[in-house]
Amino acid sequence: NIVFDVENATPETYSSFLTSLREAVKDKKSTCHGMIMATTTTELPKYVLVDLKLGSEKDAKTFTLAIRRGNLYLEGYSDIYNEKCRYRIFEDSESDAQQTVCPGDLTLPGSQNKIPYKKSYQSMESKGGDRTKLGLGQITLESRMNKIYGKDATDQKQFQKNEAEFLLIAVQMITEASRFKYIENKVKDSFDDAIGYKPDPKAISLETSWDKISNAIAKVNTPGNSIVTLPKGLLDENKKPWTTATMDELKNDIMGLLTHVTCKIK
C-alpha cells in the first residue's frame, strides 16, 4: 500500500506521494512525447491501494482507498467501524472492490457498506454540493476524514453529506492531481490554507477531459515542442476558451500522467 500521512503532510510529502502513485499505475514500457501513461485496464494487479492516515500508530485512523490502475477510478474505501473493517462501495463499483479494501469480507453489502450513488462527479455533488466550493488541502481533507471515520453510515443526512465531501476532496487531491500537474501545483500552493484551493474553471474542465487531452497529445506525429490543438470545451483559469498549448507546456505544467494511448512519438 502507498501511505499518505495526512496529519503531518506538507506540500513536499504530498508531491512525493503523488509521484509514488504515478509510479504504481504507469505503463512500464510506454511513454508518449516523453510523458508517462497509465497501464491498460486489463493489466494485473488491477488496483493500487492507498492508505490515508491520521494520528500515531496506536490511535491511527486509516482509510484504505482502492484505485483502478488502468483508469485511476476510485472504486471504494474502508475504515474501521465497531472494531471491524468496513467497506464502502459505490452503486457502480467493481464487484471485487469490497474484498480489495476488506480482504476476506464476503458479506453482502448492507446499509453500512453502500454508498447510495454512483462515482460520477454529478452523483457525488448531488450529496456533497458543488465541488468548486470545496477547498482542496491538508486541513479540508483531514476535517472530512475525522467527520466520517468509524461513524454510523445510516445517519443519512449528516454522514452522507460529510462522506460525499470527503470523496470529492479525496478524488481531486489524489486521482485528479496524479493525472494533472496543474491541479497538483494549485493544491500545493494552498496546501496549508484553512480554505484550501477551490478548483478554478481550468481544473474543472481538465477533470472531465483526461482521455480527450491524452488522445490529442498522442495524435501529434512530430517530435519536439509542437503546438497541440486541444479538445473543444476546455477553459482557462478565467473561463475563456483554451484551444491550444505547446507540448512543453503540457509536459511540464499540465499533465502528470496520460490515459493509456497509442502514440508514435515515445
Curated annotation (Swiss-Prot):
UniProt EC number: 3.2.2.22
Pfam families: RIP (PF00161)
A GO term from the CC aspect: Golgi apparatus
Subcellular location(s) per record: Secreted, Extracellular space; Golgi apparatus; Vacuole
UniProt-listed GO biological process terms: defense response; negative regulation of translation
UniProt signal peptide: none
Assigned keywords, A-Z: Disulfide bond, Golgi apparatus, Hydrolase, Plant defense, Protein synthesis inhibitor, Secreted, Toxin, Vacuole
Name of this chain's protein: Dioicin-2
Lineage of producing organism: Eukaryota, Viridiplantae, Streptophyta, Embryophyta, Tracheophyta
